[in-house]
Amino acid sequence: MVIFYAVFISLITFNAHADSHHPQEFLQSISGTKNEGEQVYAHFCVNCHATKPLIPVGAPRIGDEEDWKIRLKQGMDVLFKHTDEGLNAMPPRGGCFECTDKQLILAIKFMLPHATQEKPTK
């Protein structure tokens, strides 16, 4: 009987979450905005990549030069590949299966140390 209640509560919780989780709508609404990378980061990446992450799994922290030093030497192609395929505790596409490649790249660039970020062109 306890198992029945556990399954029942899990299904209710999952259903309630599924009804409120619409990543495609969110991603469409931010597409092309000035801070698209920041918004993708805040919605999908922040739990593991914040300066004080909720889920401390050893992911590089936003803006932390030491965390990103070795990764930056590998180049953006490798950073994107690791994001796309997943690496260590990070799931493929950072868990954002609905994100476009461009959105993932913008989120990566947003997380890089400020000094390494590309300067905007006029």
Each predicted region: which residue ranges?
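Electrostatic cytochrome c docking/interface patches
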Residues: 17-40, 56-69
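Mature, secreted membrane-active peptide modules
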Residues: 44-47, 66-67, 73-75
